[in-house]
Amino acid sequence: MKVLDQSLLWMLLPFFHLIASAAEHEEVAKHAIKLHRGKGATATQRKQWALDSCRRLTGLLRQKNVVLNKLKNAIRAVEKDTSLSGEEKLFQVHTFEIFQKELNESENSIFQAIYGLQRALQGDYRDVVNMKESSKQRLEALREAAIKEETEYVELLAAEKHQVEALKNMQHQNKSLSMLDEILEDVRKAADRLEEEIEEHAFDDNKSVKGVNFEAVLRVEEEEASSKQNMTKREVEDGLGLSMLIDSQNNQYILTKPRDSTIPRADHHFIKDIVTIGMLSLPCGWLCTAIGLPTMFGYIICGVLLGPSGLNSIKSIVQVETLGEFGVFFTLFLVGLEFSPEKLRKVWRISLQGPCYMTLLMIAFGLWWGHLLRIRPTQSVFISTCLSLSSTPLVSRFLVGSARGDKEAGDIDYSTVLLGMLVMQDVQLGLFIAVMPTLIQAGAGASSSVVMEVLRILFLIGQILFSLAAVFLLCLVMKTYLIGPYYRKLHLESKGNKEILVLGVSAFTFLMLTVTELLDVSMELGCFLAGALVSSQGHMVTEEIMTYIEPIRDFLAIIFFASIGLHVFPTFVIYELTVLVFLTLSVVIMKFVLAVLVLSLILPRSSQYIKWIVSAGLAQVSEFSFVLGSRARRAGILSREVYLLILSVTTLSLLLAPVLWKAAITKCVPRPERRSSL
């Protein structure tokens, strides 16, 4: 320790002169400002000021070299000191190296500032591109400096912690410990080892990864009415890391994985959001029920009121949407549970041909209108494909209960045809997402690469078809050998313990979801197939599972429809009401007419009457256009204006869908069957 004290004294000696001459430096700074402003700027004074500044800088650099030499000598002395343990030697040497790094970084900062000033003086103030490039270089340098400073600060914290631990060990060695103190000391050491084992060092591991950018963020604490409560909460959140971060692009972040995994944490923003949605969904859904509208209207209105265009009280929008996706999963599982595989064999040709013909017709109309309006072909294809998709969760809510009464009928029923076509559209969605990167590149590609792009698209289509064949082959094997024994074992083990049955069915659904996702097919198709496989075990199994899963589905579906409302912007709709109403009605009417024409060609004569109901179910735009639109906007396919138009048209078509569905059911379905369909 004597060596350490002497070394630190030698390190601090050069800075005593700097402290003593602080007043003189302040005068020099004031004089430099005057010179910069042109006050008292005689030639002699400017020359003398430059000479003095260079002399002082040279002296500081000379002092820095002297200190570095003394640090090297101190490091050698520590390494030769036999009285120190190996760990203590490493700690002292590391402390000296931190100080060396600080001196070198300070010197580099001086020369970087001089270089930046020189580059700025040589540049043209009218050249915005050059100034932007200079600003970008300065920003990168500041980011790198911030990372280095952050790393040094963390190392100093570790050094401080080491000193505190060394002091504690010295105190414990000088006094006798009681039995309880010895136990606590052992626990402390074990806790230290545990923290070292579970710490991942994610910052250090990822800062050098390719594609990682350093950005400045703001840390925002929750405001409290009382300043005392605010300080208390801030101290707690500083320790728990539950505050919000905001980057320069106004993206907001919440902690996902803490450094210390031994302390339990909860995202209070997310909890408040779910509680608020649950409380406001009740009056909104109740009001819609009272006036004869579907409850999903109320849930969407709830999202509008709480979203960015309303009270803006939802902070964890991404987390709410993610939880809402589970509502889609369980909704499609129940749809598959009500779906009859035997009836699927009757309509598989209709389910395959109908969506393909409709998508091709929509793309053809889109390219035609795009040619008339001089829109890029890639943009026309993308918009047409987005608008050709229909909402599977929404129509599934329409069909809940409708298939049960029709299962014993011999003719093709509208629910089976509609579900088959929607499942095929989900497959098309997965195919379109796979082809989307090629579509993005096609906008900037040369004519010589058209053949390669076509071959690439054909390869992707073949890959998707192979994945579909693998999925259906797996389903056939599961139905024959797995699902029966699995359910019987699950039912036997869950006697009087329904959570095991619920968990077993949910796990099977998630397994199918994961399999289809790994094979680049939509996760929604996996949930639907899971329900269809379980339904093959008979009517009693279907009723039992439906009784347990429906409450879970209902709650998560509320979150899903509320998350749709978060993307509804009433002010934008009001500003462009005439245009949006015209576009929405045009899209709905076009999809309805195209569906009627296609179904008239592929439906048997005995089932022609259901084409009106099926067309009404398909005459809206899928909520997945939100996802596709956001990807296309980031990729540069869509402009901001077109993206907002797609969002608004999609939302208005979803709001119009229940009215159109109710009108079609009232007009085309016999009275005894209406109650289960409405």
From Swiss-Prot:
It comes from the Eukaryota. Its main location: membrane. It is a multi-pass membrane protein. The chain crosses the membrane at residues 286-306, 317-337, 350-370, 417-437, 457-477, 499-519, 555-575, 579-599, 609-629, 641-661. Keywords: Antiport, Coiled coil, Glycoprotein, Ion transport, Membrane, Signal, Transmembrane, Transmembrane helix, Transport. One of its GO terms (molecular function) is potassium:proton antiporter activity. Glycans are attached at N174, N206, N230. It is found in: Membrane. Residues 124-204 form a coiled coil. GO terms for cellular component: membrane. It holds the Pfam family Na_H_Exchanger. Residues 1-22 form the signal peptide. Probable Na(+)/H(+) antiporter. PANTHER family: POTASSIUM/PROTON ANTIPORTER-RELATED, TRANSMEMBRANE AND COILED-COIL DOMAIN-CONTAINING PROTEIN 3. Belongs to the monovalent cation:proton antiporter 2 (CPA2) transporter (TC 2.A.37) family. This is Transmembrane and coiled-coil domain-containing protein 3. The gene is Tmco3.
